[in-house]
């Protein structure tokens, strides 16, 4: 490697905001490596991390609470540029000698801030200029407390009628604070503001690019693996597909993939995976046809959590059987991505709440003595997709909708039967086919069909049909934490419904799910 793409790095300290990962994604989008760490990161770890700049993210707490989080002292001792966002601005102000008070008027949502001072952070960045020459920015606010007195050395940079110190600056030390959220798209100039801080003020070079990431990952894998053999569980999903392409480019025939066909995949999915990787790319792929084993274990089981656990355990068992047939495999590759790493760290603090168990929780048997290779563990999902394109994977594969690990097992409500899976596969295929035909597939974030174990009367020709009911589900979302049901055109819904009922004899009725998240989850189980 000619350059270290991690050398110019930003540290983001997390105080519990729902937007913290969004800040990191924006910084990466700018082309600079960054990491998220908890606000109580040790002073030694901060110094060892050697950031070019530090961002103090937002959070739900009030600085007035006795045990509210504080920034570590090393943040100030390092004397690198500092950017406090929302709560990050408030704790920064108070820790440096300023004052923060609760506000009678809380601000949530759109606001316009007037840029009333000068500083490098906002110089030349505005949305409006009023008749008096005052510059304005359209921003997204979400706060109750506000800074009422700035620490020594700071001046007011921006204000609103209810928040006179909406932004503050100390150019001499390159310390800045904003009460709004530059990381959300509602703040129109947010990316420019973050770019100004990261590139201009911190002096970072934009080294974090897809081609550089691929080169770096290949070099890292080769250094870790040497001439040893690597095993990968290939699912056909985006993450494992990108890992397969990346490892194949890095180590060629040292990689063997195991594709477990559990009988709960989408229509023709197994054949498509084999065609893409084994035939087109020349990757060594073992296909384990385990439909009977999976469906046998699931017989009579209706509880969603139990179904997930059975599917997870059976996958591990089948994978283990195939792995033991291979000789001299030293490494196991996984498609772990950065949000998994962050969530795992969060779970260790005891603050995480399990809504649904992940299908691979529990991992592989302890007697499988593999070392892990996780080439995507530094990457967000959007970065993984860009890497996939960089590696030559087809756009439609890289930008395919998410598919749950347990597959159709959690899209068939109640007991899973082969009959139900076959009907659901056909219905789902029709729905996706028509979404593409109407140019709605990439306008939705996730779309699928759910099989409901209830029958309904229908009329076909002169005959009466008593058959199964399915529900269509399509949502739009940025982060999958919240989602809105997709307002699909009636013509599209009508076409899908007519095709499903006319082409699939076992289905008599089609419904459309108009529930958003929250309160509903995206998947039904």
Swiss-Prot record:
UniProt: ATP binding residues: 235-241
Record-linked CDD domains: GATase1_GMP_Synthase, GMP_synthase_C
Nucleotide-binding among keywords: yes
GO biological process, one term: GMP biosynthetic process
Highest taxon in the source lineage: Bacteria
Pathway: Purine metabolism; GMP biosynthesis; GMP from XMP (L-Gln route): step 1/1
Active site per UniProt: 86, 181, 183
Record flagged with keyword Ribonucleoprotein: no
GO-annotated cellular components: cytosol
Keywords: ATP-binding, Glutamine amidotransferase, GMP biosynthesis, Ligase, Nucleotide-binding, Purine biosynthesis
InterPro entries from the UniProt entry: Class_I_gatase-like (IPR029062), GATASE (IPR017926), GMP_synth_C (IPR001674), GMP_synth_GATase (IPR004739), GMP_synthase (IPR022955), GMPS_ATP_PPase_dom (IPR025777), NAD/GMP_synthase (IPR022310), Rossmann-like_a/b/a_fold (IPR014729)
Family matches, as HAMAP family: GMP_synthase
Main function: Catalyzes the synthesis of GMP from XMP.
NCBIfam families to which the protein is assigned, alphabetical: guaA_Cterm, guaA_Nterm, PRK00074.1
Oligomeric form and interacting partners: Homodimer.
Name by which UniProt lists this protein: GMP synthase [glutamine-hydrolyzing]
Organism: Pseudomonas aeruginosa (strain ATCC 15692 / DSM 22644 / CIP 104116 / JCM 14847 / LMG 12228 / 1C / PRS 101 / PAO1)
